[in-house]
Amino acid sequence: GFGSLFKFLGKKVLKTVAKQAAKKQME
């Protein structure tokens, strides 16, 4: 349903944000 799709997108966004944050900390 719509709820599961929203959850899936939320997880994807969180992963992307986490990756970019890790990159910034490495610099």
From Swiss-Prot:
<dbReference type="Pfam" id="PF17563">
    <property type="entry name" value="Cu"/>
</dbReference>
<protein>
    <recommendedName>
        <fullName>Cupiennin-3b</fullName>
    </recommendedName>
</protein>
<dbReference type="GO" id="GO:0090729">
    <property type="term" value="F:toxin activity"/>
</dbReference>
<keyword id="KW-0800">Toxin</keyword>
<feature type="modified residue" description="Glutamic acid 1-amide">
    <location>
        <position position="27"/>
    </location>
</feature>
<keyword id="KW-0964">Secreted</keyword>
<dbReference type="GO" id="GO:0042742">
    <property type="term" value="P:defense response to bacterium"/>
</dbReference>
<comment type="similarity">
    <text>Belongs to the cationic peptide 04 (cupiennin) family. 03 subfamily.</text>
</comment>
<dbReference type="InterPro" id="IPR035164">
    <property type="entry name" value="Cupiennin"/>
</dbReference>
<keyword id="KW-0027">Amidation</keyword>
<dbReference type="GO" id="GO:0005576">
    <property type="term" value="C:extracellular region"/>
</dbReference>
